[in-house]
Amino acid sequence: MKNEVFFGEGMKVVKEKYPDLYDIIVKLNDTVFTGKTLDYKTQKLIAIGIVASRCDEVAIEKQMKSAMKELGITKEEIADVLRVVLLTSGMPAFTKAMKILEKL
């Protein structure tokens, strides 16, 4: 499942133009997302919280879309994560991410 989420359109360009870099990125992805302790769904929810805390609108939307499409993560599950973001990163990060979630 993780490969379906990771290998999107942008990675096709990297694979074609920079195959050595692509191989390194794939190895890093496989090393990070092992599923040994936390399953991929949990790791994806953590990733959403991280990008939401950084207020990176493009990354927030990409992470949320792939989470819902590829992993079946619900808006309610994402909202739970965003409530943690509210406590750890403040209202601006929370409201920005919630607005993005509401549009999806």
Swiss-Prot record:
Superkingdom field: Archaea
- InterPro entries per record: AhpD-like, CMD-like
Where, by residue number, does the polypeptide cross the bilayer? none
What are the protein's GO molecular function terms? oxidoreductase activity; peroxiredoxin activity
Pfam families attached to this UniProt entry:
CMD
The entry sums up its family as follows: To M.jannaschii MJ1511.
The entry's protein name is Uncharacterized protein MJ0742
